[in-house]
Amino acid sequence: MKIAVASSDGENVDSHFGKASKFIIYEFDGEKAEILDEREVNVNPAEKHQWIKTLEAVKDCDIVIAVQIGLRAKFGLEEAGIRFVSDEGPIEDVIMRYIRHYKFMKS
């Protein structure tokens, strides 16, 4: 499973989905997560539907983790079959919280 994490500094989940300029992509095998890729998004605050460009950057992912997301972007992710998780803090902590939740839900 691929997880995209919105981060401006590569260390913290600290970005709104539609305004995120970078995503760290992790591969989660059910036990641990490893970094696969870093993806840049050309953010243009004047662009009305920035979230569409952002969605293109993560369209091969199963989960997106960001601080917040707008309603249209959330529907766009859902239509693409991508689950959104709202969280913030150090990426390692956020990923571990998600893994614990995932394992709990699978048990």
Locations of the language-model features?
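Mid-chain, well-packed structural core segment of small domains
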Residues: 55-85
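Non-catalytic interface/targeting segments
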Residues: 1-53, 60, 79, 87-107
